[in-house]
A protein has these predicted regions:
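Conserved catalytic-core segment of NTP-binding enzymes
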Residues: 107, 119-203
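N-terminal phosphate/diphosphate-binding loop that engages ATP/GTP or pyrophosphate donors
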Residues: 20-93
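Beta-strand-loop-alpha "switch" segments that mediate conformational coupling across diverse proteins
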Residues: 197-215
Length: 215
């Protein structure tokens, strides 16, 4: 990566290992000399000031909490109820402050070579009653790092997501194929990887493909 690069990280679904994959990619880029930080732009299911995903990122990246974590820049919006952002914000009776999120992301981009912004759930998760995560990705103009896996059904979910990404003109920066957690059917997992790789080569020839191992 050259200069200040911001990427939004999202996936086919929740519980697909986004946080694990985000930390892996950040660790990889840091090892390659690209100073990278992660951000969870909307965290739900946590008390004020705490983000379990950012804590996981730092642990897997081999880092202590960073000053930007303490300043709230890596976790600008936190809601207590474990639900999609539109519902969590309604339950907490507080609207999502998108200006606060944007400012935090911009500050991080000034301090680091790359910022990986982790989404909440999948691309079609509602952030508000009128806006989905994919709307935020499109409006921000940031390239997308997309996480999929080899579990049964992921080909369908992945290709539907690819069609939505292509239709909206979003730049697909990287596709991460997550082998974590272990326990998936190895035959299905191998075939899914081959199928998705061929699809990317045909439809997104400039997109990188990264395999995320079980660490």
């Amino acid at each position: 990566l050259v200069g200040s690069e911001m990427c939004i990280r999202d996936s086919i679904d929740t519980d697909i290992g986004k946080s694990y994959a985000t930390a892996y990619l950040a660790h990889l880029w840091n090892k390659q000399g690209c100073r990278t930080i992660t951000q969870k732009f909307i965290q739900t299911g946590n008390p004020e000031g705490y983000s379990e995903d950012i804590e996981l990122h730092r642990r897997l990246m081999g880092m202590e909490y960073l000053p930007e974590d303490e300043q709230g820049l890596t976790k600008p919006e936190i809601f207590s109820y474990p639900a999609s952002p539109h519902l969590a914000s309604r339950i907490d009776n507080r609207a999502i402050d998108f200006d606060k999120i944007k400012h935090a992301t911009e500050v991080l981009s000034e301090r680091y070579d790359a910022v990986l912004v982790e989404g909440a759930g999948g691309l079609m998760v509602p952030l508000t009653e009128d806006n989905l995560t994919i709307d935020y990705v499109q409006e921000s103009g940031y390239p997308l790092v997309f996480v999929t896996s080899g579990r049964l059904g992921s080909i369908n979910h992945t290709l539907l997501s690819f069609e939505a990404i292509e239709r909206r003109g979003i730049k697909l920066h990287t596709v991460m194929y997550n082998l974590f957690p272990e326990g998936e059917d190895k035959i299905i997992q191998a075939d899914t990887e081959t199928y998705i790789c061929r699809y990317i080569e045909k439809h997104f020839p400039d997109t990188a493909f990264v395999k995320v191992p079980c660490l």
